[in-house]
A protein has these predicted regions:
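Hydrophobic/aromatic-rich alpha-helical bundle segments in the mid-to-C-terminal region
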Residues: 89-98, 106, 110, 125-180, ...
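Helix-turn-helix
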Residues: 7-42, 46
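Short hydrophobic clusters on alpha-helical segments that form packing/core surfaces
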Residues: 3-8, 182
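Short, basic, alpha-helical segments at the C-terminal edge of helix-turn-helix-like DNA-binding modules
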Residues: 48-54
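Short coil/turn segments at alpha/beta junctions that flank glycine-rich nucleotide-binding fingerprints
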Residues: 10-14, 66, 87, 130-131
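Hydrophobic alpha-helical connector segments
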Residues: 46, 59-88, 139-145, 175
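Short alpha-helical functional segments enriched in proximate histidine and acidic residues
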Residues: 7, 54, 58, 62, ...
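Helix-loop "lid/cap" segments that line or gate small-molecule binding pockets
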Residues: 61-63, 78-85, 94-100, 182-186
Length: 188
């Protein structure tokens, strides 16, 4: 699975050849199909589930280590920004739903919801309920937070364009500034 995941990050779903993966791993194609009878689609669904579980565990650890809602969101942002600097092909895994069956699309949506959205939603809901965050719908706040982080991850990974301010060139700096923007807005 590691080799297939590496190829996914390099070539995208359509660019991955199972022959190349089996040759590199040193197994036969029938051996691969024994473990993944539905072939390429099932293999990459398993990789997506593994990556999402990794994200869920990382987010839950980051959240559990902090008492306040603001600190939890800072920890989430730092963890996600640092994970983006590793070789996890999350963009390609997110894109995977375009190429798989409807059943697998539903599975991926449910796994995304449980692994990324739910831990953050629980942290935000708790902060709203305790009065730390203003009265607002936690669902809206969760999607807004995820959207802002996702956008900043894209900016951080874009090779060209205007240079980022020095303070946001590290994962830590980008995380801090993004959460500050979410929590405090742009008004003075």
């Amino acid at each position: 699975m590691d080799v297939a995941e590496m190829h996914l990050g390099e070539s995208g779903y359509l660019g991955v050849s199972l022959e190349e993966v089996t040759r590199e791993v040193g197994v036969s194609k029938p051996a691969l199909y024994y473990h993944f009878p539905q072939g390429k689609e099932q293999l990459f669904i398993a990789i997506a589930h593994r990556a999402l579980e990794h994200h869920r565990e990382g987010l839950e650890r980051a959240i559990a280590a902090h008492p306040s809602g603001a600190a939890k969101l800072r920890a989430v942002a730092r963890w996600l920004m640092s994970e983006s600097n590793q070789d996890h092909p999350m963009d390609e895994l997110r894109d995977l739903s375009r190429f798989v069956s409807e059943q697998h699309q539903l599975e991926l949506a449910e796994a995304f919801f449980g692994s990324l959205y739910s831990p953050i939603h629980r942290a935000i809901s708790s902060a709203v309920e305790s009065g730390e965050f203003s009265e607002n719908r936690p669902e809206f706040l969760t999607w807004a937070f995820l959207s802002l982080l996702s956008g900043m991850l894209q900016v951080n990974n874009t090779p060209s364009g205007p240079a980022l301010p020095q303070a946001t060139r590290t994962a830590e700096g980008m995380a801090e500034h993004t959460v500050d923007l979410f929590l405090n807005g742009v008004l003075p």
